[in-house]
Amino acid sequence: MDQTIDWWPSPAKLNLFLHINGRYPNGYHQLQSLFQLLDKGDELAFTVTPHAEITLLTPIDGVANEDNLIVKAARLLQTHTGCSEGCDIQLRKVLPMGGGIGGGSSNAATTLIALNYLWKCNLSLTELAELGLALGADVPVFVMGNTAFAQGVGEQLTPVNIAQKHYLVVFPECHVSTAEVFNAPDLPRNTPLISWQEYDFDQTHNDCQQLVCNRFENVANTLRWLLEYAPSRMTGTGACLFAVFTSNQEAENVLANLPSGCSGFVSKGVDVSPVHDKLAHLGSIS
């Protein structure tokens, strides 16, 4: 592949905790979470074209291009701004789909940010985040680009700085439907609200974890295995799990012993998204 291609990072995230506090009249869940951005993820490349067509050159198996959040994000920005240009898009897919680490939402956010720059739309990050909310509740956190304490349906974001840890992220090779988890009658929905100042990893949890472990034996077994090495938890609605380490080498040592039927990677937490680092390098961030 052409080494001159300009790749834009599309980082993963972890939910270091996920508390479900209730349900709104519209059916959405009231929640609190801590979004930790990671330094690894997918990559996207964009070639601006003079015609308005949006073309994803590297489609994802099982996902029609029309349903891909990358294409949806590009068209949403195009429609919102009246931009007459289009683009060809390439994707280097690293993150698992349906894993709870934000792959699709991150792809959408990077698309909005990159094309806002390349098409010279001049929208602010706040405007892009508001636009991105129509694509998914997690898109704004990737657009705003900070590790953040989230409330509401996940759209009320308070940027925070936390001690950066090393994480082993493990995918037990099964797909967990977010909709099925959130619609499950036995999902806890009454965890008391906390303030950011009260946050402590050991005093928080993921309200979706037990339900998913009850339904997916390989998630439960992999979590038990991880807990032998370090504090561990499910992220989002799964199926990805993570273990927390103080050094990269500790995480790599455990990765080397990963059980069969799982895949994984080691990553470091970052307070600022790699895509924001790229924007800063280009001299364009607001």
UniProtKB/Swiss-Prot annotation:
GO terms for biological process: isopentenyl diphosphate biosynthetic process, methylerythritol 4-phosphate pathway; terpenoid biosynthetic process. It catalyses: 4-CDP-2-C-methyl-D-erythritol + ATP = 4-CDP-2-C-methyl-D-erythritol 2-phosphate + ADP + H(+). Transmembrane segments: none annotated. The keyword DNA-binding does not apply. Keywords: ATP-binding, Isoprene biosynthesis, Kinase, Nucleotide-binding, Transferase. Pathway: Isoprenoid biosynthesis; isopentenyl diphosphate biosynthesis via DXP pathway; isopentenyl diphosphate from 1-deoxy-D-xylulose 5-phosphate: step 3/6. GO terms for molecular function: 4-(cytidine 5'-diphospho)-2-C-methyl-D-erythritol kinase activity; ATP binding. Its EC number is 2.7.1.148. HAMAP family: IspE (MF_00061). This is 4-diphosphocytidyl-2-C-methyl-D-erythritol kinase. It comes from Pseudoalteromonas atlantica (strain T6c / ATCC BAA-1087).
